[in-house]
Amino acid sequence: MSVPPRDVIVIEACVLSLASNVKQPYYLQKAKDWLQNFGTLTLSAIHPSEDIRIDNNLHDDLNKQTSNTPVYFNQVAYLDFAQPIDYWQWLQLTKKFEQQQDRLLYQKPAVTLDVDIIAVKCLHQIDNIDQSLDEKGNRFVLFAKSENQWLGIRRRFPLACYDQVGIVDLSKNIDLSFIRNF
């Protein structure tokens, strides 16, 4: 079975979800140091998943902790790339970086570092984006049609509570209302 050709999606910024439940300060700092190599980085505060409470019960099932579930420490990052990069190349780089963080030394539910793309800001408008698929075969979420359109990674929505908290934190300095209101 052949893989369909992928559209070139050149991005100039992205929003990432970072998470760790093994030596959290160490691995989240490594993520920060690595991401800064690509451009201007803005980070939310770090939030332990057990400390996040929501009032509207929309995502309770996503955030329930059991006594056997290690507490994740979560952070949301906004990265404004110094040089535009192809989405697929960026995705490969983030997954390769994850694997280089001692992930093979631990078994789930222990995770040294997750780096997940939430949304990307495209350099140019993509006319056929409603037909484009991400690496899991899902269509992208189009937040707003504009010269620099933002696309969301569908499987990340609705946002988990820990990502919502990070987005709200980042929104104090960066307009991410299009994600918050989705």
Residue ranges: model-predicted function:
Residues 1, 8-10:
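Charge-biased, low-complexity intrinsically disordered regions
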Residues 7-8, 108:
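Short hydrophobic/aromatic segments of transmembrane alpha-helices and their interfaces
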Residues 3-4, 65:
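Short hydrophobic/aromatic-rich motifs at helix boundaries and adjacent loops
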Residues 26-86:
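Short, surface-exposed acidic-centric catalytic microdomains
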Residues 18-20, 77-83, 119-122:
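Short beta-strand-to-loop capping motifs
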Residues 56, 68-71, 88-91, 96-182:
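Flexible, gly/pro- and Lys/Arg-enriched active-site loops
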Residues 11-15:
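Extreme N-terminal starter segment of soluble prokaryotic enzymes
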